[in-house]
């Protein structure tokens, strides 16, 4: 076991309504996580640490929002003595007033995935090819109307890099306080053609440093703080209960299944940067 596990990512569904051109997830099935699997993961983690963050992801996690509600209720009923924070990473296209009210009631922190304005329609279209950006922006406006703060996560590729400065200006005008830049992690060999120019990205970061917004990016983090994986503080469980050190490594290096705890083996991994990104680039360049 890894001591001090603090961050549990639950892939509550593999279903998604978008078709991102660089998708990290394997969307070959439409399976939802069941409550038993989620419960086993939570029980396992809370045996290691009573202060944890549970993040709901997918797919698009709002497609299985009933499970999210059930998980929070379970934790409130059974772990009221623990410090548990909740977060969701969503494309925001499904957010309506009912969901916004429930998110606020359950005190779930929100992260929204969007890669720009017009360019987002190319990078993150719907399954049928139609644009998704306006629906994401609509979800953002609904959250804002309910005074629900949210951060933005943007995957940086060579397609959207030229437009990111204007996008940041838009977010500032909208009232967004923080944005995370996540350099593309190539899940397939063809994704290597989308890799951004790191020198140009660093130039952009230097320019954005004068803007009134908190910019989080993996490039500038201390090496031992690059991600939860490097400190042994991350557990990712997919819809089947399979365990990985990082969502990006799903399907590549399974460490067991949460429903068979006797066979779980979690090594400690140290990396100079993003272990998953390094691993994938080396793999696909062979």
From Swiss-Prot:
Sequence similarity: Belongs to the radical SAM superfamily. Anaerobic sulfatase-maturating enzyme family.
Binding site for [4Fe-4S] cluster: 16, 20, 23
Name of the protein described by the UniProt record: Uncharacterized protein MJ0907
Keyword GTP-binding: no
Gene3D superfamilies the record matches: Aldolase class I
Range of residues in the leader sequence: none
Cofactor: [4Fe-4S] cluster
Organism in which the protein naturally occurs: Methanocaldococcus jannaschii (strain ATCC 43067 / DSM 2661 / JAL-1 / JCM 10045 / NBRC 100440)
Residue ranges constituting the Radical SAM core domain according to the UniProt record: 2-221
Keywords: 4Fe-4S, Iron, Iron-sulfur, Metal-binding, S-adenosyl-L-methionine
Gene Ontology MF terms in the entry: 4 iron, 4 sulfur cluster binding; metal ion binding; oxidoreductase activity
């Amino acid at each position: 076991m890894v001591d001090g596990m603090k961050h549990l990512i639950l892939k509550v569904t593999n279903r998604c309504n978008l078709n991102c051109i660089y998708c990290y997830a394997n969307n070959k099935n439409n399976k939802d996580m069941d409550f038993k699997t989620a419960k086993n993961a939570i029980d396992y983690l809370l045996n290691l640490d009573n202060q944890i963050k549970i993040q709901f992801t997918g797919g698009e996690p709002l497609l299985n929002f009933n499970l999210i509600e059930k998980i929070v209720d379970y934790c409130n009923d059974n772990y009221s003595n623990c410090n548990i924070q909740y977060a969701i990473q969503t494309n925001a296209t499904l957010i309506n007033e009912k969901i916004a009210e429930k998110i606020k009631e359950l005190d779930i922190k929100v992260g929204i995935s969007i890669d720009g304005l017009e360019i987002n329609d190319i990078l993150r279209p719907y399954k049928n090819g139609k644009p998704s950006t306006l629906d994401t922006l609509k979800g953002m406006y609904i959250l804002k109307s309910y005074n629900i703060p949210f951060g933005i996560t943007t995957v940086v590729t060579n397609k959207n890099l030229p437009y990111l400065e204007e996008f940041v200006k838009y977010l500032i005008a909208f009232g967004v306080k923080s944005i995370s830049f996540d350099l593309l992690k190539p899940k397939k060999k063809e994704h290597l053609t989308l890799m951004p120019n790191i020198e140009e990205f660093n130039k952009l970061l230097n320019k954005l440093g004068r803007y009134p917004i908190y910019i989080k990016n993996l490039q500038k983090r201390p090496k031992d703080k690059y991600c939860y994986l490097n400190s042994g503080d991350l557990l990712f469980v997919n819809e089947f209960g399979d365990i990985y050190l990082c969502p990006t490594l799903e399907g590549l290096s399974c460490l067991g299944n949460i429903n068979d705890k006797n066979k779980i083996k979690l090594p400690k991994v140290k990396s100079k940067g993003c272990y998953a990104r390094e691993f994938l680039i080396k793999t696909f360049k062979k």
